[in-house]
Curated annotation (Swiss-Prot):
Chain residues that bind Zn(2+) 2: 80, 82, 106, 109
PANTHER family (alphabetical): E3 UBIQUITIN-PROTEIN LIGASE MARCH 2/3 FAMILY MEMBER (PTHR46065), E3 UBIQUITIN-PROTEIN LIGASE MARCHF2 (PTHR46065:SF4)
The protein's name in its UniProt record: E3 ubiquitin-protein ligase MARCHF2
GO process terms (BP): antibacterial innate immune response; antiviral innate immune response; endocytosis; positive regulation of lysosomal protein catabolic process; protein ubiquitination; suppression of viral release by host
E.C. code: 2.3.2.27
Length: 245
């Protein structure tokens, strides 16, 4: 996780209010001087969420340690051994984090999650906004393949027709040269096609291995709610005790 100019594990926040990289984002929110400005990113640098928490905004309950939102739209879970504010997380946020980081354990307490991984399809790889150089190379290779394939076929056919004509005229040396040229042409074409195909297959296989769809295996929905209720009660009690009357 990258937080401003600092690096922390998911769920931790650092004071980056003086960072010039986020000054425009802070001014646009209208929250005044921020207490925390945090960006949650995956290992490959993709931004997962940006969080700005103001000094005047008190914490009125548990929130997700990844997206830093409460349990308004989705219930919070405590699937690992983390306690306190780091123990609550949305199921969808955790699944997205595990998929982006290509891990199956909590990076704080190292608890192994029961997950189900499913590989992504070829169309998802083509639509993925990954490195532009890979997509550009793929487009260039496809265009070259569509252009070179008919060109190689026509050139080989013309060379063989010329070799037949020279054989009728008893010009064996010229016919042998045209046959050798045809063999060399098709050898180069086949080698280039195989190398390009293998290169892109390796890229696709690596992408599928590191970008799998992760589904967190929990018990029943009722147990998820009961699993979180002690955590929520403890946090609310702690906040109530620390709040001056």
């Amino acid at each position: 996780m990258t937080t401003g100019d600092c690096c922390h594990l998911p769920g931790s926040l650092c004071d980056c209010s003086d960072s010039p990289a986020f000054s425009k984002v802070v001014e646009a929110t209208g929250l005044g001087p921020p207490q925390y400005v945090a960006q949650v990113t995956s290992r490959d640098g993709r931004l997962l969420s940006t969080v700005i928490r103001a000094l005047e905004t008190p914490s009125d309950g548990p929130f997700c340690r990844i997206c830093h939102e409460g349990a308004n739209g989705e219930s919070l879970l405590s699937p690992c051994g983390c306690s306190g504010t780091l123990g609550a997380v949305h199921k969808s946020c955790l699944e997205r984090w595990l998929s982006s980081s290509n891990t199956s354990y909590c990076e704080l307490c190292h608890t192994e999650f029961a997950v189900e991984k499913r590989s992504r399809s070829l169309t998802e790889w083509l639509k993925d906004p990954g490195p532009r150089t890979e997509k550009r190379t793929l487009c260039c290779d496809v265009v070259c393949f569509l252009f070179i394939t008919p060109l190689a076929a026509i050139s080989g056919w013309l060379c063989l027709r010329g070799a037949q004509d020279h054989l009728r005229l008893h010009s064996h040396l010229e016919a042998l040269g045209l046959i050798a040229l045809t063999i060399a042409l098709f050898t180069i074409y086949v080698l280039w096609t195989l190398v390009s195909f293998r290169y892109h297959c390796q890229l696709y296989s690596e992408w599928r291995r590191t970008n799998q769809k992760v589904r967190l295996k929990m018990q029943a929905d009722g147990s998820e709610g009961s699993q979180h209720s002690p955590l929520a009660a403890g946090l609310l009690k702690k906040v109530a005790e620390e709040t001056p009357v």
